[in-house]
Amino acid sequence: MPDPNLPDISPDSFDAVLFDLDGVITDTARVHAAAWTETFDDYLRGRADATGQPFVGFTEHDYLAYVDGKPRYDGVRDFLASRGIVLPEGSPDSPPDEESVGGLGNRKNVLMRERITRDGVEVFDGTVAWIHALHARAIRVAVGSSSRDTTLVLEATGLRDLFEAQVDGLVRAELGLSGKPA
């Protein structure tokens, strides 16, 4: 008997279903937000101390407006621009303590990876049940994310084997695809 809580999807109607990772399969938004907050608050506090200007922390509005769902370095640039701050670009190889777009982005990534490894990531059980139901109906399932850490998240949650295809920030960079719009 079909699950009444799941949409009636048949292989005759769909070849595959693509799920977004962040906010659909896993609650990584909380982990991302905490890592961004720690990164930017540390930077902004140091900047305030050095310039004598008041410290104004990174907010939930800042997270949603400037960094959520974007490639990491785009998020750094957009947030800093919102505060009138211009930093050197740096590079993807910039050390996480470097005062640059690359350095701040890499610092956020170090903090996020530490949190995922230490604390894990919450999974939305209803979505996982739906994925299993799709498999039972022989419908292919893929996962998409702008994150370069999709594999880390899937492995931390034990979900990696549920997906036949994965398109993420690593694939985006490899193929030169644009990220989500600013």
Predicted segment positions?
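N-terminal helical cap/lid subdomain that shapes the substrate entry/recognition surface
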Residues: 10-21, 25-125
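A short, compositionally biased domain-edge/stem linker segment
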Residues: 1-8
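Substrate-recognition "cap/lid" segment bordering the active-site pocket of phosphatases
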Residues: 139-142, 148-182
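Catalytic-core regions built around general acid/base machinery
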Residues: 126-137
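Core-facing hydrophobic residues within beta-strands of well-ordered domains
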Residues: 14, 131, 162-164
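Hydrophobic packing residues within well-ordered alpha-helices of enzyme cores
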Residues: 36, 76, 127, 150-154, ...
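Short alpha-helical
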Residues: 31, 71, 129, 148-152
